[in-house]
């Protein structure tokens, strides 16, 4: 039987569509249904590697995990990774097809519609419910004739639409009514209910507004979802990153981690596990004076290493980071950050830049050569030497014992090759890629152990390694070690917390009627 569908659209970006979809995936999964997420086209710099080596938006990987299914490229058949100047790398069914200007990309929409329809069809054949996420707003009237992600998909899937608005930013009633006013009659008819998201306060005070909203539009309110604090679920939207730049400085007993906020930052969810650790303050910085007395400086991934390296030099951060590292300051680079910490960076084919070559910061003995072949893989690895950062043995993979002890997981997403030179020590020894044995060495460690680079995203998601790193940082500062391991919820516990809050806020009977579950 073909799967039922439900679609979450929003009045704007960052109203909570991705998390609402993740909640619905977990809600339906807990009822014993086979659930899959779907987003036809995603524009994001946070991406994820599927087991078969495809690249999809991070949000759909999160939603798949919430649904307890393996992420596949059909869940996000088109991914756009912005490169600047109205250009994006276009990834179709997990593979890059090139970099296109927005005007050129729109010429492909007919072909993309067919690809999207086939992906959606495969998901519907294999599952009971498909939870579909829209993008931005369906009321972008200047783009409506090019739509392949909002009402076009709702029609193709015959999906009822839940229209979400963010009350925390203000103006939610105007946003919902205004969106409905700009939709075509057939599109308005497809909107089955409203969801008010991120509510704080007394619901009784909101109820008159909800009644007026339904009276004006004829659309019921499915529920009012509370503002949920400190969810350990990866963000995708750059809007969420903006808020995290304005963090208070670390207190006397807290660890201070400074993340360089590169203009083209990508996969910045690499640092989220650090943000959720007690006694740790993560700051995003853009100026040399903001480094302060940071215990760790982290250079994250970037969509354009060459361009962001030029920005790093122009901002003065390159010199400041290098000077600090040469004095023994601990520094970590992930993916593009690893490349920047190295020496020669070559781009003879113009994969990333018109510049054929550049020099990194010279803190690691690695050489980078960009090539058109893209590496996308889930990996399993171990520490290659005595330590991850600091003196040998200071940081390890944790205290686990038995089969799999010391094994780390993550994923690679990068163009070209990064190789060690001059006998540099590797950071990690990869054992497998994509579930297949493929031994290789990754990254590099400086001679004094103060600087480490790796091409593996998600490495700090490994609890043992992360906590060992934080313990070493505390010891270096003379701070007491944490009293035992903090009780940090697992991601699945967080999906349940999210689902519990959303399910308690929605009219279940109405939701079942909208989706069609009352008839099955």
From Swiss-Prot:
Q: Is this entry keyworded Cytoplasm?
A: no
Q: Which residues form a coiled coil?
A: none
Name the Gene Ontology biological process terms: cobalamin biosynthetic process
Where the record annotates domain GATase cobBQ-type, the positions are 254-465
Molecular function terms from GO: ABC-type vitamin B12 transporter activity; catalytic activity
Q: Which UniProt keywords apply?
A: Cobalamin biosynthesis, Glutamine amidotransferase
Q: Where is the active site?
A: 335, 457
User: Which pathway does the protein contribute to?
Assistant: Cofactor biosynthesis; adenosylcobalamin biosynthesis
SUPFAM superfamilies from the UniProt entry: Class I glutamine amidotransferase-like, P-loop containing nucleoside triphosphate hydrolases
Q: Which Pfam families match?
A: CbiA, GATase_3
Q: Does the keyword Coiled coil apply?
A: no
Its biological function?
Catalyzes amidations at positions B, D, E, and G on adenosylcobyrinic A,C-diamide. NH(2) groups are provided by glutamine, and one molecule of ATP is hydrogenolyzed for each amidation.
Q: Which family does it belong to?
A: Belongs to the CobB/CobQ family. CobQ subfamily.
Name listed for the protein in its UniProt record = Cobyric acid synthase
Q: Which gene encodes it?
A: cobQ
């Amino acid at each position: 039987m073909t799967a039922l569908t439900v679609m979450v659209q929003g009045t704007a970006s960052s109203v909570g569509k991705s998390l609402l979809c993740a909640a619905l995936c977990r809600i339906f999964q807990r009822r014993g249904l086979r659930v899959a997420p779907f987003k036809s086209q995603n524009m994001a710099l946070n991406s994820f590697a599927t087991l078969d080596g495809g690249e999809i938006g991070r949000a759909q990987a999160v939603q798949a995990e919430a649904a307890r299914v393996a992420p596949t490229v059909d869940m996000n058949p088109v991914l756009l990774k912005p490169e600047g100047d109205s250009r994006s790398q276009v990834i179709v069914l997990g593979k890059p097809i090139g970099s296109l200007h927005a005007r050129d990309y729109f010429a492909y929409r007919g072909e993309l519609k067919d690809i999207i329809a086939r992906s959606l069809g495969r998901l519907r054949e294999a599952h009971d419910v498909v939870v579909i996420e829209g993008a931005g707003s369906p009321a972008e009237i200047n783009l409506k004739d090019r739509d392949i992600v909002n009402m076009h998909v709702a029609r193709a899937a015959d999906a009822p639409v839940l229209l979400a608005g963010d009350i925390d930013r203000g103006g939610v009633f105007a946003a919902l009514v205004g969106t409905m006013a700009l939709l075509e009659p057939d599109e308005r008819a497809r909107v089955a209910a409203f969801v008010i998201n991120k509510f704080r306060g007394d619901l009784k005070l909101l109820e008159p507004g909800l009644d007026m909203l339904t009276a004006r539009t004829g659309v019921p309110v499915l529920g009012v979802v509370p503002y949920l604090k400190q969810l350990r679920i990866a963000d995708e939207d750059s809007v969420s990153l903006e808020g995290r730049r304005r963090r208070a400085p670390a207190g006397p007993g807290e660890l201070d981690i400074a993340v360089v906020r590169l203009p083209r930052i990508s996969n910045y969810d690499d640092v989220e596990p650090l943000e959720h650790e007690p006694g740790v303050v993560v700051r995003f910085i853009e100026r040399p004076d903001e480094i302060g007395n940071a215990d760790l400086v982290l250079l994250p991934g970037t969509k354009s290493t060459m361009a962001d390296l030029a920005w790093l030099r122009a901002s003065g951060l390159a010199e400041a980071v290098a000077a600090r590292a040469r004095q023994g300051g601990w520094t970590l680079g992930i993916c593009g950050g690893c490349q920047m910490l190295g020496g020669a960076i070559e781009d003879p084919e113009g994969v990333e830049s018109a510049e054929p070559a550049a020099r990194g910061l010279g803190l690691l003995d690695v050489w980078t050569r960009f090539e058109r072949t893209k590496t996308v893989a889930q990996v399993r690895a171990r520490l290659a030497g005595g330590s991850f950062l600091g003196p040998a043995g200071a940081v390890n993979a944790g205290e686990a014992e038995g089969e799999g002890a010391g094994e780390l997981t993550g994923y690679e997403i990068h163009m070209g090759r990064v190789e060690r030179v001059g006998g540099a020590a590797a950071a990690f020894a990869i054992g497998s890629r994509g579930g297949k044995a493929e031994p290789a060495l990754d990254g590099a460690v400086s001679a004094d152990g103060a600087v480490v680079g790796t091409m593996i995203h998600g490495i700090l998601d490994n609890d043992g390694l992360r906590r060992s790193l934080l313990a070493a940082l505390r010891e270096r500062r003379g701070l007491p070690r944490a009293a035992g391991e903090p009780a940090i919820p697992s991601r699945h516990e967080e999906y349940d917390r999210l689902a519990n809050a959303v399910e308690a806020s929605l009219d279940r009977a109405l939701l079942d009627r909208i989706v069609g579950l009352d008839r099955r």
